[in-house]
Design a protein with these regions (language model features):
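Ser/Thr-glycine-rich phosphate-binding loops at phosphate-binding pockets of nucleotides
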Residues: 25-31, 42-44, 85
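Cytochrome P450 core scaffold surrounding the K-helix E-X-X-R motif
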Residues: 31-34, 65
Length: 175
């Protein structure tokens, strides 16, 4: 077959390149609406539950933080996904697709970096593994302060802090 004048042959190769993306959801929680007391599906189906933020960072330059319905999920089609505690993020993603909260896509693989850290003999928590591997201390104070707070009731300053926190978690997960 002939070569199209409108495309560079190198662009065909780029279409087939597999990338890796870190995905991290931020969700509402309080004492009664909690994964610890309700389990995963009980938590997701609780009337107070809200997945109000997702951060997605890719090795090809993607850096997104915002409401999950605003992310271009099909962009991740066929790629590798990482989450630090994938049993939460992957299950929430699938649950959200089934509920019509956001569109689905088919990923190549979805790996848990928390499980990987534990397998390698590192602390399972992102905070612990980041400290040990990268000699980097990260604060989980923002996450602790998010308890019982709805996105719409947070101050603009606190929302910016939540977004920065979420983005940092995905950046470290990808790292």
């Amino acid at each position: 077959g002939g070569q199209s004048l409108n495309t560079c042959p190198c662009m065909d190769d780029m279409k087939d390149t597999q990338h890796t993306f870190a995905v991290d959801f931020e969700t509402y929680y309080d004492k009664s609406c909690s994964i610890k007391t309700l389990g995963t599906l009980g938590y997701f189906s609780h009337p107070e539950f809200d997945a109000y933020r997702v951060s997605v960072v890719g090795d090809e330059g993607t850096s997104f933080v915002g409401h999950p319905k605003d992310f271009d999920w099909p962009k991740l089609e066929g790629h590798i996904i990482l989450s630090h505690n994938a049993s939460f993020d992957e299950t929430l993603f699938i649950y959200g697709v089934k509920k019509g909260w956001w569109p689905g896509f088919t990923w190549a693989e979805w790996h848990c970096t928390a499980d990987l850290a534990a397998y390698c003999g590192l602390p399972r928590s992102l905070k612990g593994s980041t400290a040990e591997v990268f000699n980097l201390e990260i604060s989980k104070e923002t996450r602790n302060t998010m308890m019982g707070k709805r996105w719409e009731s947070m101050s603009e300053e606190f929302q910016k802090g939540v977004d920065a926190y979420a983005l940092k978690d995905s950046e470290l997960c990808l790292r």
